[in-house]
Amino acid sequence: MWISYIDLAGISSGSESAFRSGIADMYDNCAALGINTVYVHVRSHGDAYYCSDYFPRTKYLGGTYDPLKVMVEEAHARGLSFQAWINPLRGCAVSDISRESGYKLYDWAGGETRLVQVGSYYYLNPAYTEVTDLIAAGAREITANYDVDGVHIDDYFYPTTDAYFDSAAFSQSGLSSLSDFRLANCDRLVSSLYSAVKKGNSSTIFGVSCQGSLYNNYNYMYADVKKWCAQSGYIDYIMPQIYYGFKNSAEPFEQCVNTWNNLAYSGGIPLIVGITSAKLGLEDKWAGDGKDEWITDEYILERQFLASRELASYGGIGIYSYGSVFNADYSVRSLVEREIDALKSAMN
């Protein structure tokens, strides 16, 4: 189960005891559903939900206690595996840059090289070794100082295909293909994270939750997930976000999940299938002929689980997200509850 910074903000408190009680309740809900692993945000916007030497304390949680210490303790007390979820490239909102004072992101702001503004947010540019070194150091301190079971990143790689984002670094590279340049940078980022995680604690696993579309990963995110699955030194598991229905015109679920199964199987790594309850009861406007499937069809999540567990490389499913399961909007709440009950019955 993914527990995002948005979910954590709902239990934000300056009091450690109140935060501990809130996260305990969330974990209890997860355990009752049959969840055995939680993927919890510890860096969402160039910040830290723990005591960090490299990033400032998140604005989303008050107080001076150590949130990560509490979150790991309460997870393990319930037999839940805890994976620290970081967004490596996404930085803070432009309006929040003063919070980075005293840290590298503040020093790099305004230069438009190592930290680049995209819309209302800053993003780190992985073209520079000092940037990937910083990201790796942030991962290493987590695994060295906390009893986390894994480190987990999602699909926030390059935030734009526009050339302005890394034009200076690209022009200095001597390469002719911007795509090849960016793919290589993401390769270096992921391999650096893998090495840093293992250096902090050799038993900690590292995985990537990329987009469900291979085409989008390669051409828009510049994430060569095929290479990461096939070659050692990148990831211990792959967790694609296969947030598609069975009737999706471009990426029908069964076709998509089988493609990922083949990639994972050939690389000898587990496939954890990311599914979502966030679409239940809503139109999926990018699904083509299947745009109404999440409104009209029943037991989609259960059927996705049943299809996934038959795969040779199956390592589990992951559900996005805690809020969409346990705090669904009133307009779809009864539908979500029914669908989750069916999924729970199938899993247990």
Task: Label the predicted regions.
Residues 1-3, 38-40, 82-86, 151-153, ...:
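Hydrophobic faces of well-ordered beta-strands that scaffold small-molecule active sites
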Residues 1-20, 72, 83-84, 89-145, ...:
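Active-site-adjacent "subsite" loops/lids of carbohydrate-active enzymes
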Residues 9-31, 131-142, 216-233, 253, ...:
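Short, acidic/polar
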Residues 9-21, 43-48, 61-62, 212-221, ...:
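Acidic-and-aromatic substrate-binding clefts and catalytic sites of carbohydrate-active enzymes
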Residues 19, 69, 109-231, 243-244:
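Polysaccharide-binding and catalytic clefts of secreted carbohydrate-active enzymes
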Residues 21-47, 145-150, 231-238, 308-317:
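Catalytic domains of carbohydrate-active enzymes, especially glycoside hydrolases
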Residues 26-27, 44-90, 173-200, 252-253:
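Aromatic-lined substrate-binding rim segments of carbohydrate-active enzymes
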Residues 232-252, 259-348:
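Substrate-binding cleft of secreted/luminal carbohydrate-active enzymes
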